[in-house]
Amino acid sequence: MATSAEAPAKEAQKRDSQPQKQKRETQDEAELLTVPDGWKEPAFSKEDNPRGLLEESSFATLFPKYREAYLKECWPLVQKALNEHHVKATLDLIEGSMTVCTTKKTFDPYIIIRARDLIKLLARSVSFEQAVRILQDDVACDIIKIGSLVRNKERFVKRRQRLIGPKGSTLKALELLTNCYVMVQGNTVSAIGPFSGLKEVRKVVLDTMKNIHPIYNIKTLMIKRELAKDSELRSQSWERFLPQFKHKNVNKRKEPKKKSVKKEYTPFPPPQPESQIDKELASGEYFLKASQKKRQKMEAIKAKQAEALTKRQEERNKAFIPPKEKPAVKPKEASTETKIDVAAIKEKVKKAKTKKLGALTAEEVKLKMEADEKKQKRKK
């Protein structure tokens, strides 16, 4: 029999053991949620489905005219790759279509979906070497339609070129960061790679079509890649490390030249305009007799006529008004104060007399004589 002193001690031990069990359970759950590095899902073999499939499944897709020559050349390789998984592939050059269908030997139920993706990628100008990777278990594909995202054709071409970058540098950087193969062709972007990479590629492509430059997303991907290497930061939030970009281009609305100032809102309707009878009542004309009204009208007409007559007379009289003459400017009298240097003028006249017209100056004569002497020396 247990004593009364031992009972509380056992209860205390139970209480201590409960949080330890909870911690272990949470640790086990965390270990289950995290996928260990280098782990691969076991491949689907014939032993998993020995009886095969019950019904035949098939998929077909059309391809453009310019892909006909390439598909005709690489079709034996496509058939060889699909025959390994017991899938039949046919190429119809007349109709311009590719078809894949399961056979009685097909054991993998999902291989037909991968074969469908293979022919879709081949139709979207992806090379056979890259498209055949879709048959692997850890590889997926995503065909992003970008044609309907931008209305203006010129703007669409510019944004698509921005995604490719100068000499394909932006696309190459995106491929290295996401471990995906990306192919931009026409109105679609085809991507092949792991699921995590495809998610990032789709985000970058859609953001580029929404006029967000891909360099911003590439920068965040580079930071995420470096943070993933740190084991401590793996389980933490990365928001504080990621850059926050501000939109610089603000849509400025064109303001009108004439701004109409809105009146203050009043719940009451505007006052009713005065009628002719109201005006007559206010002035007292309403109570006058017909003869008095007629007399007033005639007086108003005569006053108007008199005003018009005076105006007309003023306009006629304007023609007879002489224009204003400019004030006469008096000629300036020659000032007697200005002194003339007579001696300087005499010297100038003497020099002019001694000098012949077209004669050389003393300096010019010296230079000419020196030049003649040099010529004579050379001749000797």
From Swiss-Prot:
Entry GO MF terms: RNA binding
GO cellular component, one term: nucleolus
Annotated S-S bridges: none
Keywords: Isopeptide bond, Nucleus, Phosphoprotein, Ribonucleoprotein, Ribosome biogenesis, RNA-binding, rRNA processing, Ubl conjugation
Gene Ontology process terms (BP): ribosomal small subunit biogenesis; rRNA processing
UniProt modified residues of type Phosphoserine: 4
SMART domains, per the entry: KH
Function noted in UniProt: Part of the small subunit (SSU) processome, first precursor of the small eukaryotic ribosomal subunit. During the assembly of the SSU processome in the nucleolus, many ribosome biogenesis factors, an RNA chaperone and ribosomal proteins associate with the nascent pre-rRNA and work in concert to generate RNA folding, modifications, rearrangements and cleavage as well as targeted degradation of pre-ribosomal RNA by the RNA exosome.
Name the record gives this protein: KRR1 small subunit processome component homolog
Organism: Mus musculus (Mouse)
